[in-house]
């Protein structure tokens, strides 16, 4: 709560001149260009986000949609890292009946990795698909994410699902932990803030999943144990947040969320970031402060 208040206070006095949001667009189609009879209008420049890039020495991508939209490097590619896990769970849900979640998946010690905090406890018994979804989405367990991909038929099958969802940008090529290498210029395992954010918007707020499946995924995202210092730290107190984080090399820190501010319509916030050196540290305050700006602008 202290972190949230500090972040929101930082932006309470920030002027909005030159930073107004652009009109809202439907969740099921790409945002239309604003045009005249001959040329497209110049995109709105969000000076506050440019200043955050300077302050944190980072590249920052933002796509937010509510009563309006905010776009900053919204169509640039970033490594998505663990944010794929919510999408993988959605693909498993989409392709199978809810009863399939009771299927037990077995694995071995060889499948474990550093981030296998939950799956490490169940090597002898295996885990039900519903529990793997929980471990992957709520705890960002790497082995659980990989096992969801395995259940789909591999990374390419997740990409195929996203194409069916209407996402022509996000691509899944590898598995954990390779996806966290986040090498600049490598298109593998990348997305844009717009594409990734729109995916989550369709899954959580749209009809991409049947109601029971949507509710199951939304509940996992709302009860995530990661990201307390990211988007959740930048929203108004009392907001409900359904989010998935991702972290990798080159200071990569991401958070994708649907936020329900008290008494307001939901806002989709997709924030992705990276730095220039492989061993660079990420700073979650960058995401929290970018979130505070987004909320201040769109509410």
Give the residues covered by each predicted segment:
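Structured C-terminal helix/loop/strand segments within mature extracytoplasmic catalytic/sensor domains
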Residues: 2-15, 20-36, 41-50, 151, ...
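Mid-domain, small-residue-enriched loop/turn segments at the edges of structured enzyme/sensor domains
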Residues: 59-60, 149-205
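Active-site-proximal beta-strand/loop segments in catalytic clefts of secreted hydrolases
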Residues: 65-66, 137-140, 151-152, 175, ...
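Conserved catalytic neighborhood of penicillin-recognizing serine enzymes
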Residues: 112-148, 155
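Acidic helix-start/capping segments at beta-turn-to-alpha-helix junctions
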Residues: 103-118, 152-153, 179
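Active-site SXXK
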Residues: 78-107, 269
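A short, well-structured edge-of-sheet supersecondary motif
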Residues: 43-74, 103, 259, 269
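Short glycine/serine- and small hydrophobic-enriched flexible loop segments
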Residues: 90-98, 150, 198-205, 292-296
């Amino acid at each position: 709560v202290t972190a949230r208040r500090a972040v929101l206070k930082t932006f309470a006095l920030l002027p909005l001149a030159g930073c107004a949001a652009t009109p809202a667009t439907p969740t099921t189609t790409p945002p239309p260009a604003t045009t005249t009879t001959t040329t497209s209008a110049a995109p709105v420049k969000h000076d506050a986000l440019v200043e955050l890039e300077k302050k944190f020495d980072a590249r920052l991508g933002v796509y937010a949609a509510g009563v309006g939209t905010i776009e900053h490097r919204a169509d640039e590619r970033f490594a998505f890292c663990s944010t794929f896990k919510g999408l993988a769970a959605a693909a498993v849900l989409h392709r199978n009946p809810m009863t399939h979640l009771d299927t037990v998946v077995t694995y071995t010690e060889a499948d474990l990795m550093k981030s296998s905090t939950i799956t490490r406890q169940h090597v002898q018994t295996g885990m039900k698909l519903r529990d793997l979804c929980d471990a992957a989405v709520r705890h960002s367990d790497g082995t659980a994410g990989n096992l969801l991909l395995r259940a789909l038929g591999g990374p390419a099958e997740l990409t195929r699902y996203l194409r069916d969802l209407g996402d022509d940008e996000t691509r899944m090529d590898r598995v954990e932990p390779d996806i966290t290498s986040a090498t600049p210029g490598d298109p593998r395992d990348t997305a844009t803030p717009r594409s990734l954010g729109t995916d989550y918007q369709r899954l959580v707020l749209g009809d991409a999943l049947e109601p029971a499946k949507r509710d199951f995924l939304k509940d996992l995202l709302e009860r995530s144990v990661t990201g307390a210092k990211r988007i959740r730290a930048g929203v108004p107190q009392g907001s409900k947040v359904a989010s998935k984080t991702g972290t990798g090399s080159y200071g990569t820190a991401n958070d994708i969320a649907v936020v329900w501010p008290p008494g307001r319509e939901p806002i989709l916030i997709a924030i992705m970031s990276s730095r220039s050196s492989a061993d660079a540290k990420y700073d979650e305050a960058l995401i929290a402060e970018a979130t505070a700006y987004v909320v201040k602008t769109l509410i």
